[in-house]
């Protein structure tokens, strides 16, 4: 029996949003020191490009990892309806007490895209291009005792040992 082929499927979307990099856990002076001009009281905006990638076996019946329509609808719900042309700090509850860094934006998108997918374990990566030079990639929570494998498996640090577990 041959091994089932695995493929990556990526959908790209662009949205615009504004924010102010500011942490309620820091003083105003500390915020200015950490975030510099991005801590401007009036905020600033970005034209973000987001790439959502799923990874999984190619279904023998459909020839697909995931129907691209399902991914498109998840992106529409999570990104376009909730984030596009919004002030992240004021319009998105998640950022009320969480700094709206691109790293945290990637976590927000990851968590919410997973809720939209029939098979959330297929979500492999959220990549956000904040600018042409600043890009954040997020592949989900990192387990402390192993390297993260997005098909709900852990791979031991010892490259000679491969440990799989579906119960994580």
Curated annotation (Swiss-Prot):
What UniProt keywords are attached to this protein's entry? Lyase, Metal-binding, Phosphoprotein, Tetrahydrobiopterin biosynthesis, Zinc
Molecular function per GO: 6-pyruvoyltetrahydropterin synthase activity; identical protein binding; metal ion binding
- One GO cellular component term, please give it: mitochondrion
Reported EC number(s) for this entry are 4.2.3.12
Q: Tell me, what is an example of a GO biological process annotation in this record?
A: tetrahydrobiopterin biosynthetic process
Q: How is the cofactor bound?
A: Binds 1 zinc ion per subunit.
Q: According to the UniProt record, list the residues that bear Phosphothreonine.
A: 161
Give residue numbers for the modification (Phosphoserine).
Answer: 159, 164-165, 167
**Does this UniProt record's set of keywords contain Phosphoprotein?**
yes
> What cofactor requirement does the entry state?
Zn(2+)
> Which pathway is this protein assigned to?
Cofactor biosynthesis; tetrahydrobiopterin biosynthesis; tetrahydrobiopterin from 7,8-dihydroneopterin triphosphate: step 1/3
Coiled-coil annotation reads none
Q: Record's Gene3D superfamilies? A: 6-pyruvoyl tetrahydropterin synthase/QueD
Instruction: Give the positions the UniProt entry annotates as the active site.
Output: 38, 85, 130
Recorded hits in InterPro entries, A to Z, give: 6-PTP_synth/QueD, 6-PTP_synth/QueD_sf, PTPS_Cys_AS, PTPS_His_AS
Q: Which Pfam families does this one have?
A: PTPS
Which positions bind Zn(2+)? 19, 44, 46
Q: What else is known?
A: The active site is at the interface between 2 subunits. The proton acceptor Cys is on one subunit, and the charge relay system is on the other subunit.
Assembly and partners are described as: Homohexamer formed of two homotrimers in a head to head fashion.
Q: What does this protein do?
A: Required for pigment and biopterin synthesis.
Q: What is this protein called?
A: 6-pyruvoyl tetrahydrobiopterin synthase
Species the sequence originates in = Drosophila melanogaster
The gene designation is: pr
């Amino acid at each position: 029996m041959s091994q089932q082929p695995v493929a990556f499927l990526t959908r790209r979307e662009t949205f615009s949003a504004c924010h102010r990099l500011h942490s309620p856990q820091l003083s105003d002076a500390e915020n200015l020191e950490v975030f510099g001009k991005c801590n401007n009281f009036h905020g600033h905006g970005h034209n973000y490009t987001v790439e959502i990638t799923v990874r999984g076996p190619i279904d023998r019946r459909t020839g697909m990892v995931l129907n691209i329509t399902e991914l498109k609808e998840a992106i529409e719900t999570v990104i376009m309806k909730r984030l596009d042309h919004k002030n992240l700090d004021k319009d998105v509850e998640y950022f009320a007490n969480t700094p709206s860094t691109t790293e945290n934006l990637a976590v927000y998108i990851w968590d919410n895209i997973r809720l939209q997918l029939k098979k959330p374990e297929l979500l492999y990566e959220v990549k956000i291009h904040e600018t042409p030079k600043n890009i954040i990639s997020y592949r989900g929570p990192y387990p402390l005792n192993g390297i993260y494998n997005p098909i709900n498996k852990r791979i031991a640090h010892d490259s000679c040992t491969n440990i799989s577990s579906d119960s994580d």
